[in-house]
Amino acid sequence: MNKTYLPPQDIEGKKWYVIDAEGQRLGRLATAIAMIIRGKNKPTYTPHMDTGDFVIVVNAEKVTVTGKKSSQKLYRRHSGRPGGMKTEVFSKLQARLPQRIIEEAVFGMLPKNSLGRKLHNKLKVYPGSNHPHEAQKPEKLTIQTIPGGER
């Protein structure tokens, strides 16, 4: 019988990565971010523990989708009251709250339990190119989300 590896829980060992979302495909970018936040890119990955790193996403307003998704993809939210369902297409939400698009895509790929709720704090999304996390000395991480492309 195999035993699950139990890594030491040290917050100092967590890395910070900064990812530029300009021109990147939404789904492929969100998949890569979720893997880093969850810690699946490390040999010390443990399913029931937080072994992932922090991710800062800049230029969230410049993320792209393919096909007609910008006019057909719907984002829904509910106020909790009867008739309180609000729907918004991708292009309008991108103009209003561009960081919410990446947050929803990544959070949908994380576990729906207490560990998943803790992992939400590891994602920092900013619409512009500036972020307030220079003190953490984040590493620049490039992710290729365009198949056969230069990014």
From Swiss-Prot:
Gene Ontology BP annotations: negative regulation of translation; translation
Cited function: This protein is one of the early assembly proteins of the 50S ribosomal subunit, although it is not seen to bind rRNA by itself. It is important during the early stages of 50S assembly.
Self-association state and partner proteins as the record states: Part of the 50S ribosomal subunit.
SUPFAM superfamilies reported for this sequence: Ribosomal protein L13
InterPro entries hit by this protein: Ribosomal_uL13, Ribosomal_uL13_bac-type, Ribosomal_uL13_CS, Ribosomal_uL13_sf
Residue span of region Disordered: 126-151
MF annotations from Gene Ontology: mRNA binding; structural constituent of ribosome
NCBIfam families in alphabetical order: rplM_bact (TIGR01066)
Keywords, comma-separated and alphabetical: Ribonucleoprotein, Ribosomal protein
Record's keyword annotation contains Isomerase: no
Sequence similarity: Belongs to the universal ribosomal protein uL13 family.
Coiled coil stretches, renumbered: none
Species: Trichodesmium erythraeum (strain IMS101)
Name of protein: Large ribosomal subunit protein uL13
A GO CC annotation given for this chain: cytosolic large ribosomal subunit
Stretches with biased composition (Basic and acidic residues): 131-140
